Amino acid sequence: MNIISVGVNHKTAPIEIRERIALSEVQNKEFITDLISSGLAHEAMVVSTCNRTELYVVPAMTEVTGEYLKEYLISFKDARKEVRPEHFFSRFYCGTARHLFEVSSAIDSLVLGEGQILGQVKDAYRIAAEVQAAGILITRLCHTAFSVAKKVKTKTKIMEGAVSVSYAAVELAQKIFSNLSMKKILLIGAGETGELAAKHMCQKNARNIVITNRTLSKAEALAEELGTGKVLPFESYKEYLHEFDIIITAVSTKEYVLREAEMHQSMQKRRLKPVIILDLGLPRNVDPDISRLQNMFLKDIDALKHIIDKNLEKRRGELPKVQAIIEEELVSFGQWINTLKVRPTIVDLQSKFIEIKEKELERYRYKVSEEELRRMEHLTERILKKILHHPIKMLKAPIDTSDSIPSRVNLVRNIFDLEEPNQ
């Protein structure tokens, strides 16, 4: 039984191709339903995100190859003018399992260790299950992938350390102040970067965040989303700088929103209580001379990127541990796949001996008492289990270089004179 994976991702195709081939949830359901209903696949699942669209298919006929599935997806998206087969990757058998394990454990992500992908794989499995496209193989594959991801998260540090500017800023603030719930925070700028930083702050138990933005309604909307309910008019935030322990700037401007003179006055009002300023703007939002002030800690994007680079280096050092977990699970998954291949022979073998047993017992049904017949049934069942134990164990055993599943199946079928499947 084969399982094929084909798709595009950040390694194989530029973003415009990934966008063109991506599937919405509605399209996802339609696509895999088409594959199943047309008799092309027994099972199917699609993982579709901004960085990847990947098919996982158990084909129902030999004609359904990796190349066939590439063309099928291109045709479904009516993208023949833009998308070519060389934009795709292909994986087969255990290669497919390895790929999904790597994706789920976040070592195939655009950002190493970015854990969001696991939730997206779970969504893909949910969608496939909802349209009855996830059978025994994809179900086992996905649940093994989820188990791999859990082990990777708990047994390695591949997901530790900030690898985004906004998150690095928040981690740095936490290292300096430890308990963010006791600190008052000013966010200057309610755009995407500022919003991310504020949300990361909330995740670290920050409870007192005040937001200011040129467009007051945008600041109010973010404050409501965060649950802080606190905003300052952009024209007046400088009057309150002395009240804040942490200041985050994330605005698009060519002029500094914080200068040395005003921060000097603020520090005098604070009686030199420490302040962290996290400048997430590009160009810089904060006068770099501010760093000369006593108890003033200023970090800009370059400083934060240095932290990110060190964290990424640490994550890369965890890769051998992650690969070891994946290899261990691949062996178990491969052994399970082998049991699927021998299952029909095991069923046929058991059925044949049960049939023999029933025929022989039937001959004595009216020659012995009911009690004696029950004893005979119990005895013959025990004998059958012992007779069949070794051949079944041999069929399920891990394969080595001198053996193969087909040769074992043929051997057992010949010895016990079993008919070929589907005859």
UniProtKB/Swiss-Prot annotation:
Residues that bind substrate: T49, C50, N51, R52, S109, E114, G115, Q116, Q120
Question: Which organism is this entry from?
Answer: Chlorobium limicola (strain DSM 245 / NBRC 103803 / 6330)
Designated gene of the protein: hemA
Supply the domain comment.
Answer: Possesses an unusual extended V-shaped dimeric structure with each monomer consisting of three distinct domains arranged along a curved 'spinal' alpha-helix. The N-terminal catalytic domain specifically recognizes the glutamate moiety of the substrate. The second domain is the NADPH-binding domain, and the third C-terminal domain is responsible for dimerization.
Pathway listed for it is: Porphyrin-containing compound metabolism; protoporphyrin-IX biosynthesis; 5-aminolevulinate from L-glutamyl-tRNA(Glu): step 1/2; Porphyrin-containing compound metabolism; chlorophyll biosynthesis
Task: Write down what this protein is called.
Answer: Glutamyl-tRNA reductase
The beginning of the lineage is: Bacteria, Pseudomonadati, Chlorobiota, Chlorobiia, Chlorobiales
EC number(s) from the headed UniProt entry? 1.2.1.70
The UniProt entry, under Gene3D superfamilies, shows: Glutamyl-tRNA reductase, N-terminal domain (3.30.460.30), NAD(P)-binding Rossmann-like Domain (3.40.50.720)
Keywords, in A-Z order: Chlorophyll biosynthesis, NADP, Oxidoreductase, Porphyrin biosynthesis
Please list the residues that make up the active site. C50
Q: Which CDD domains match?
A: NAD_bind_Glutamyl_tRNA_reduct (cd05213)
